[in-house]
Structures are given as C-alpha cells and as structure tokens.
C-alpha cells in the first residue's frame, strides 16, 4: 500500500507551492516545516519538465507533482524513488507514448532517473482506481510502459494533501476529492488481506527486505490510524521505537540497521529475526484491528 518495494520483492498513494524561488517545496504535516526539494531531485525535475513540454502542448499539461518520501521530507539519496504524477487534460496518444518512452530512457542514464516511478493520468480519471480506468502510461524504475501502476486511496490522498507542485495547477487545487474513510479502508485491506497473508509465510522473513518492509509499513499504518495523516517510513519506524515494549527493541534496532547501515553486522540471527518479525507483525495486526 505505502510502498512498492514489497510488491517488487515478491514478484511478488494539500501543499501549496509557497515560493517559486525554491522551485518547489512542501510541508512536514506533523511539524509544519517547509521542505525544499533536494538539489539532485530539483535538477532532475527541471530537466524532466523542460523535455515534457517538448512532447505535450502547454495546455495539455495540467500539472506535475511529487509525492512519496520526497514530499514527506524523508529523501534518501541512495535509495529513495522519485514518485511523481503528471496530470494531463486528456489521454496520451500513440506518438506521445513513444516520445515518453524515449524521454524516460534518456533520463534513466542518471542514477536518480532510473528511480523515477510515476503515472500520466488524464484529468477525468483523477481520484479513480485502476479497475475504473483505461490503461495509462506509467513509469517504473525509470522505464515507461502502458498498463496500470500504484494507485489507491493513499496515492490520491497524499497527492491532494501532501503533494509538491513542480509545474501547473497547485496540488491542493486539482479537481478531485478523496475521503479519509477511503484511506482507512485501504489500510484495513492492507492489514487484513496483504499482511495477514504474509504472516502465514514465515520463510519470507528470512529475507532482509521483507523484515524491513513488514515493520516500517505497519508502523506507518499504525501512525496513520492514530494521527490521521501519512508519514514516511522513517517516521513509521520511529513511532514504533517510541511506543513498543522492550521485547521488540532489538528487532526495531535491527530494522534501523537494515535501513541506515545495511553493510554492518546483523544484531540477530536470521532464524531469530524471522521469528521475531512474524510475531511482531501479528502483534501489530491485532493492534490495528482495535482501531477499525
């Protein structure tokens, strides 16, 4: 739900543009702190928007928006994706599709360009879900294709309420509505279906990425249910560190190690870490169920 990483491993969603002088910026919804884009992301998006305007007429581009970890002020230069939504006035035609494929191929020559994940969504489809939409152009790991990508209530809520405007109409002003109850229902599905099923597959948690994904995603879900806003993976992990009992402290420190210092020695054996992760996941699932 929050992250595309777990799906990829197993193959297994309103901020004003306060100052043009910063090119783009955002707000930490918890603290009300303004964030400028990291320099390398700003440079990438400047190049992207210049080339995008060579493909689409100005009137076809409603806006380009950044969401995800960057908009939440939690960008990690080595690992963070550049999550974006480009809203256009109508569908992409065949010639434009080919030009977008070439654009992303060119941008993926850079390390950050390879981590662009996004969608080209017609204005009339804003707020809809994949089963209500025709196929659209999307970008995954810097490669453009046609099909369906990462759309759910969380996508739309973060775009509308926390999205950073790169160009065009302000994110908070784009014409669609998303209800908080829809976000909660997405969380509920994620907990009751996705993670409940993963908890039945304990072998998954011998893989480091699954340990990290399970813990930080459940931390984000729990924070969201408690505080009615979306936060980064880092904040989700910090929330668990602040509220969990001592019996989980070593596991949480191990997840922090995976995220921050992956080359350092493990704090737990693979067997113990996998067992603790599954038990903690089940504990967090029950905690979330008390909040529906």
Task: State where each predicted segment sits.
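Conserved NTP/Mg2+-binding pocket subregion across the NTase superfamily
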Residues: 31-34, 97, 102-208, 212-215, ...
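Helical scaffold of the NTase/Pol beta-like nucleotidyltransferase catalytic core
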Residues: 28-64, 95-96, 292
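Positively charged N-terminal leader segments that act as targeting/secretion signals
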Residues: 5-22
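Catalytic metal-binding acidic patch
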Residues: 66-104, 113-122
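Conserved nucleotidyltransferase catalytic core and NTase-mimicking acidic/glycine-rich helix/loop elements
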Residues: 158-292
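Glycine- and acidic
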Residues: 30-35, 86, 262-267
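Soluble or luminal CAZymes and related metallo-dependent hydrolases
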Residues: 40, 44, 99, 272, ...
């Amino acid at each position: 739900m929050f992250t595309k990483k777990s799906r990829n491993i197993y193959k297994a969603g309103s901020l004003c543009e306060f100052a043009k002088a910063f090119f783009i910026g955002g707000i930490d919804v918890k603290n009300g702190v303004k964030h400028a884009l990291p320099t390398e992301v700003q440079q990438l998006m400047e190049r992207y928007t210049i080339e995008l305007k060579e493909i689409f007429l100005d009137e076809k581009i409603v806006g380009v928006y950044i969401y995800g970890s960057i908009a939440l002020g939690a960008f990690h230069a080595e690992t963070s994706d550049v999550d974006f939504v480009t809203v256009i006035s109508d569908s992409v035609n065949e010639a434009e599709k080919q030009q977008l494929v070439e654009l992303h191929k060119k941008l993926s020559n850079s390390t950050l360009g390879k981590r662009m994940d996004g969608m080209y969504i017609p204005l009339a489809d804003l707020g809809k879900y994949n089963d209500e939409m025709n196929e659209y152009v999307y970008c995954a790991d810097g490669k453009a294709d046609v099909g369906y990508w990462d759309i759910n209530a969380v996508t739309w809520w973060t775009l509308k309420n926390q999205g950073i405007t790169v160009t065009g109409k302000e994110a908070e002003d784009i014409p669609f509505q998303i209800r908080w109850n829809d976000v909660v229902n997405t969380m509920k599905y994620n907990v009751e279906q996705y993670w409940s099923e993963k908890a039945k597959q304990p072998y998954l948690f011998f893989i480091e990425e699954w340990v990290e994904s399970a813990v930080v995603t459940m931390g984000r879900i729990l924070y969201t249910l408690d505080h009615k806003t979306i936060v980064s993976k880092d904040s989700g992990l910090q929330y668990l560190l602040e509220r969990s009992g001592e019996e989980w402290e070593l596991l949480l420190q191990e997840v922090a190690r995976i995220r921050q210092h992956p080359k350092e020695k493990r704090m737990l054996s693979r067997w113990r870490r996998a067992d603790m992760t599954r038990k903690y996941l089940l504990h967090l699932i029950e905690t979330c169920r008390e909040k529906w």
